[in-house]
Amino acid sequence: MAKDIKFSEDARHAMLRGVDALADAVKVTIGPKGRNVVLEKKFGSPLITNDGVTIAKEIELEDRFENMGAKLVAEVASKTNEVAGDGTTTATVLAQAMIREGLKNVTAGANPMILRKGIDKAVTRALEELKAISKPIESKEAIAQVAAISAADEEVGELIAEAMERVGNDGVITIEESRGFTTELDVVEGMQFDRGYLSPYMISDSDKMEASLDNPYILITDKKISNIQEIIPVLEQVVQQGKPILIVAEDIEGDALATLVLNKLRGTFNAVAVKAPGFGDRRKAMLEDLATLTGGQVITEDLGLDLKSASLDMLGRASKVVVTKDTTTVVEGAGNEETIKARVQTIRNQIEETTSDFDREKLQERLAKLAGGVAVVKVGAATETELKERKLRIEDALNATRAAVEEGIVAGGGTSLINVIPAVRALLSEVTADEATGVKLVLRALEAPVRQIAENAGEEGSVIVEKLKNESVGVGYNAATGEYVDMIAHGIVDPAKVTRSALQNAASVSAMFLTTEAVIADKPEKDAPAMPDMGGMGGMGGMM
């Protein structure tokens, strides 16, 4: 395919038009008085959102060179969302400011490669200062503030703070759509996996359609049980203890399942059978997790263990097990605390080492089931459009809260970026002329988020930026009320990780943009000529 090539100024300015198109659409959403953007969907109702990365992903421009510029900035938003889960609009605003300022300097003759060094030095200094001014987050109230600011909704803030308090920092919090109008929290204590009873005759509560076992023994195996003779020895030992038993196996079928059901109906003993969760290697790992949590052993041929020789000390214990048609929940497993902690640490190490997003998600689920619990935020709304928008905001709030717990908080509303300006300005005396231009470029860009928040609130951005530069550290502009306040004291905070990621990613893409000298795009293909008209086919008039 033929290619279209543009060089130097032509290339950069074509891409800049794309950067501006995307950034201008995204930046209207920043701040408490930011607006929404409506996205057309091929099917269903349009999506109304103020989520930067969602807007950025939707933008496709007709001009291929402009589209490349837009995609570069979309990458900033996407990467920030991946690392911190929020701050995508801030990252986009910073990237646009750096690119515009940098392009002026490159056009005026600055060397882009040395300019890049100046940008890198300035951003490194800014990140050091951000780390120094960040404060750790400890109280439930502080967590609620972070979530409330991100979602622009205090009720959501309270909900997420409660979820994190209930399941801990390692717990899984999932967001689902509710059938009602209200948003509510549902917390599952203990370990839950997606496997239900193998026979409805095993239920103990016909109203709730669930089987509840108090202080049961738990037999865990990766084998398929089809012959009852294999497990009779261990069942006899459990019956002597007068306790119920939960059997977790690859499958239980035929004679074995029929015998368990028959004895349950006769009242001889209470047994519930479920299939093992997961598949393949993940199944083995999940069974090991369950064994660790309950203080039992996985009876597997890999370890030379056989069901016929299983004894009571190989079985796990828990204070309660509840089995429904689709799920099994094990509450208060009797596993050794130290063994559970060691298992948790192993999973944490695997999370850090894995490169697959899918594997990371599954490992985090396993970690939550061992270390914390699972909370489900059920999002309700009057219409489907509102539901989608609300769900996106709650996802952002949850990500922002996790980021805050990880690296602490800084003053919100772009204030922290203004606060690091003096430290970055001090670099000017330490760098060369073109590097100094790169530092000044970053200094100017650090003002951009506050400027945009003010402009979205109908104020003059430059006036507010100058006033904040003369205020003490931590004092910022509350765009919701139009007042200058101590941001942290008023609960207007940003996670340090979000601000850090936004600045780092914006600087990285801006530096790449400014050092671009040629841009190559595919030439649009010409449409093939249409078939000639088939008229004039005489002699066919009689055909019906």
Curated annotation (Swiss-Prot):
Its EC number is 5.6.1.7. It is an enzyme of class 5 (isomerase). InterPro entries: Chaperonin_Cpn60_CS, Cpn60/GroEL, Cpn60/GroEL/TCP-1, GroEL-like_apical_dom_sf, GROEL-like_equatorial_sf, TCP-1-like_intermed_sf. Keywords: ATP-binding, Chaperone, Cytoplasm, Isomerase, Nucleotide-binding. It holds the Pfam family Cpn60_TCP1. GO terms for molecular function: ATP binding; ATP-dependent protein folding chaperone; isomerase activity; unfolded protein binding. GO terms for cellular component: cytoplasm. ATP binds at T29, I30, G31, P32, D86, G87, T88, T89, T90, G413, N478, A479, A480, D494. It is found in: Cytoplasm. It comes from the Bacteria. GO terms for biological process: protein refolding. The keyword Transmembrane does not apply. It catalyses: ATP + H2O + a folded polypeptide = ADP + phosphate + an unfolded polypeptide. Forms a cylinder of 14 subunits composed of two heptameric rings stacked back-to-back. Interacts with the co-chaperonin GroES. Together with its co-chaperonin GroES, plays an essential role in assisting protein folding. The GroEL-GroES system forms a nano-cage that allows encapsulation of the non-native substrate proteins and provides a physical environment optimized to promote and accelerate protein folding. Belongs to the chaperonin (HSP60) family. This is Chaperonin GroEL. It comes from Exiguobacterium sp. (strain ATCC BAA-1283 / AT1b).
